[in-house]
């Protein structure tokens, strides 16, 4: 999860988030090189006395500054499109969980089980135990098996919401009357925190998400107790 004064993204826990981190570094390097070139040209203009006031056109220069930006945009677009297709591809999910946004809580339904569903509310600050996180803890965590492909179906009962867990690279809009889907896979166990990322009313800040990723054997024992 995030920590105070953090500058970068959260540590990647899923294959998708690892790809997003690589893409972030790739794009940042391109931006850094462009910025360095622009600063170098500006410094030359300020320090040199050589000018070309009589130059009316320069076909070679115009060709370069037309083709070069096009190449740079292609270098950014290709890996971006690859990740978009990866995020949209869901093949043979091992488990499907339906998520519904409400003002202001989340409800979850494990569709592969006959009667496994619950609501998830934020724990008020005055009820937190030592070591628990303010505005991020919930009364019912979403327990899921790690290292398995999980399909999340996301919608809303009232207004627009957004179901987001940054360390897993997840952010999907919850839209009334529409069912969006995304894929989830965690490579290691642990607690992963998120929040509603779409302003949805006065208590928008009080809609946390907590995923508890566990080994398959633990998940089977938990689901048996819940059902």
Swiss-Prot record:
Subcellular location: Mitochondrion inner membrane
Residues where Mg(2+) binds: 198
Residue ranges that the UniProt entry lists as topological domain Mitochondrial intermembrane: 1-14, 88-227
Recorded GO MF terms: copper ion binding; cytochrome-c oxidase activity
Main location as per UniProt: mitochondrion
Cofactor: record remark: Binds a dinuclear copper A center per subunit.
The protein's enzyme class: translocase
Gene Ontology terms describing biological process: ATP synthesis coupled electron transport
Membrane topology according to the record: Multi-pass membrane protein
Keywords: Copper, Electron transport, Magnesium, Membrane, Metal-binding, Mitochondrion, Mitochondrion inner membrane, Phosphoprotein, Respiratory chain, Translocase, Transmembrane, Transmembrane helix, Transport
Cofactor: Cu cation
Binding site for Cu cation A1: 161, 196, 200, 207
Residues spanning the membrane: 15-45, 60-87
Catalysis: reaction(s): 4 Fe(II)-[cytochrome c] + O2 + 8 H(+)(in) = 4 Fe(III)-[cytochrome c] + 2 H2O + 4 H(+)(out)
Binding site for Cu cation A2: 196, 198, 200, 204
Chain's role: Component of the cytochrome c oxidase, the last enzyme in the mitochondrial electron transport chain which drives oxidative phosphorylation. The respiratory chain contains 3 multisubunit complexes succinate dehydrogenase (complex II, CII), ubiquinol-cytochrome c oxidoreductase (cytochrome b-c1 complex, complex III, CIII) and cytochrome c oxidase (complex IV, CIV), that cooperate to transfer electrons derived from NADH and succinate to molecular oxygen, creating an electrochemical gradient over the inner membrane that drives transmembrane transport and the ATP synthase.
Protein name as it appears in the record: Cytochrome c oxidase subunit 2
Gene: MT-CO2
